[in-house]
Amino acid sequence: MKYELQTTDGRARRGRLIFERGVVETPAFMPVGTYGTVKGMTPEEVKETGAQILLGNTFHLWLRPGQEIMKLHGDLHDFMNWHGPILTDSGGFQVFSLGDIRKITEQGVHFRNPINGDSIFLSPEKSMEIQNDLGSDIVMIFDECTPYPADWDYAKRSMEMSLRWAKRSRQRFDELENKNALFGIIQGSVYEDLRDVSVKGLVDIGFDGYAVGGLAVGEPKEDMHRILEHVCPQIPEDKPRYLMGVGKPEDLVEGVRRGVDMFDCVMPTRNARNGHLFVTDGVVKIRNAKHKDDVSSLDEHCDCYTCRNYSRAYLHHLDRCNEILGARLNTIHNLRYYQRLMAGLRQAIEEGKLELFVVDFYQRIGKPIPPLAEKDVAASN
């Protein structure tokens, strides 16, 4: 993988990730394909929304169908018939979400298989081996996702363990002679001094890109923005920056304003299945009765298959009848909305008009613009 930074507007960056399997224009949003599928979508449909890279889930694919089934097909790309780049998370977030059925040690994490109750062990080395078998174009290190809230002492211990695991991930990745990209994950909760130690430690080890982890886990938005403003300038300029598990459209806008290049989240697909649809002027709750006889399209500014062919009344009808097609059409639209948003951000950065884009975006959705730190305002001016 090669990252090319093309231009900037304030802290925001316009670039591209170059893989053997294709080019990803950044800032980029990655749809989530947890079990080797973006729920309800064929790979061709996902591609038509504008997505250039997907996220796969190491933990879930390890449990089902398992490494051996994957290798029978070649790798994850062949298994799911997606031939663009794939980023896989390390499994750390899912393991630490298991709560009482897992035990963290220096060596790794012991836990009960949530499917059948079997005792399983996942370590940095094992995560690297699984992701190698998946053929991931971007491999994520195995880390401890620090919960929120966490006091300073706990966050420090967690961050330091993640750094030790980062070294082990790097070592095993290199031993496997994996030629793809390996990203480090910056931890430290909401504490700037701990984030400083994490960034420096990871940069000293050396990675192909750097993710900001441990955000979007319940902390106030102001803390997320503060940490991004503090951390992003410390990441080497020639390496991509990835904000994990984020988020709402406004979170993507704010991440881009602060220098983030990559995002992923289940929100567009999960919300689509629940009838919450993102449009230029905010959110449409399609199951509300007011849409029962609305013959207009979902979003007159959208060029997706759903908006070109179906009315709000039809989408409302499908939702009320729990028809599978409704979830599919909703998902097509939400994914396209996210890709259109990212394309708009990229164009605004290219033209040096990002703040005008931001003003228009917030006016349309009827929300105030979150302030940038003073040094970021100076950069954008």
Curated annotation (Swiss-Prot):
Keyword Secreted annotated: no
* UniProt-listed GO biological process terms: queuosine biosynthetic process; tRNA wobble guanine modification; tRNA-guanine transglycosylation
Asked whether the keyword RNA-binding is assigned, the reply is no
As its record notes, the protein acts as a catalyst of: 7-aminomethyl-7-carbaguanine + guanosine(34) in tRNA = 7-aminomethyl-7-carbaguanosine(34) in tRNA + guanine
- Single GO molecular function: metal ion binding
Keyword list (alphabetical) reads: Glycosyltransferase, Metal-binding, Queuosine biosynthesis, Transferase, tRNA processing, Zinc
Question: What EC identifiers does the entry list?
Answer: 2.4.2.29
**Family from the record:** Belongs to the queuine tRNA-ribosyltransferase family.
Q: What is this protein called?
A: Queuine tRNA-ribosyltransferase
Species annotation: Pectobacterium atrosepticum (strain SCRI 1043 / ATCC BAA-672) (Erwinia carotovora subsp. atroseptica)
Name the gene behind this protein.
tgt
